[in-house]
Amino acid sequence: MSFLLNHYKIFFSSSLNHFLAIFILSIYPLFFFMGTGVLNTCIVLLDLIFIIDIINKKKFSFLKNYTFYSLSLFWLILLTNLLFSIDQLNSLGRTLGFIRFIFFVMLLIYYFNLENQKYQKIILSSWLTIFIIVSLDLIYEILTGQNILGYKSYMPGRLAGFFHDELIIGHFYYAFVLIILVYLLKIFSNLKTHLIKKNFY
């Protein structure tokens, strides 16, 4: 308990930019249930906070790494392919919009590594909590035919969960399941190490 409290003390004593970024990132999975428009707005807002942060702190060197260069190269390839697209106008928005994901990946790396990765623990703990609640809700839906809010899938055999009339719960799992599994493995590994040290040292 004291371990988590220390992390949250750092969170609440951080700068406004950090506070907003970590708070939005912590509840990021919830935006999946609010629709694509809200989710994309969230990403753009986080991108702006991140850009302001690195400008204020003059941390431009952070962008000088393999990940940023690789994503930027991929974006340039998309722009080049746009020249040969049959429907250039329709493809233009998606291609230009890809830049928000480049900055989103970079801001995840940036904030995950601040404060000796303490922000990372806050964010991933929140994601894990949300993921568990969503999973328990799906189990409840399997057993009762509706989720805890009373939502029912219009298609028998398909689960809706908190998405109500949109059968896209699989997209949510694809986005978070690997991250959650890696985080759980890290938790169990740290717990195992702690128990070994406690018993033998």
Please provide the spans of the model-predicted regions.
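Non-cytosolic membrane-interface motifs at loop->transmembrane helix junctions
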Residues: N90-G97, Y154-A160
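Transmembrane signal-anchor hairpin modules in multi-pass inner-membrane enzymes, especially those
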Residues: M1-N90, Y110, L114, K118-K121, ...
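Alpha-helical transmembrane segments of multi-pass inner-membrane proteins
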Residues: Y28, L79, K121-Y154, G161-Y201
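Hydrophobic core segments of transmembrane alpha-helices in multi-pass, intramembrane catalytic enzymes
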Residues: L39-F50, G93-L107, E141, I148, ...
